[in-house]
Amino acid sequence: MSRDFSRTVRVADQIQRELALLIQNEIMDPRVGMVTLTGVEVTRDYAYAKVFYTTLGGDENIQLVEEGLKHAAGFLRSQLAGKIRLRVVPQLQFVYDESVERGMKLSRLIDEAVGKA
């Protein structure tokens, strides 16, 4: 059981590395600017992969980046097939990662609480 889990994690890490390079070097869509991939979760059968990302800018920019990534998902999957040796290359689903924003808000609240004490 743990061996299967570790392989899933290794595949997710490899997908994250390859996608980061592909987005940086191959995607020419102006909507997809400064994107940072924060994590990838792959299903056990490798059919689907959730790709978590962050980007700079407000809500409008987040929406534009998401549209650009969804538009490029097929291209990225086909490029990924040539770089990763898997029987099935997962379908990519891009999800905005709000954990960074939540962490900054919590840090700000802690700083305010410490400042008042």
From Swiss-Prot:
Its main location: cytoplasm. GO terms for molecular function: ribosomal small subunit binding. GO terms for cellular component: cytosol. The keyword Transmembrane helix does not apply. It is found in: Cytoplasm. Belongs to the RbfA family. Monomer. Binds 30S ribosomal subunits, but not 50S ribosomal subunits or 70S ribosomes. This is Ribosome-binding factor A. The lineage of its organism: Bacteria, Pseudomonadati, Pseudomonadota, Betaproteobacteria, Nitrosomonadales.
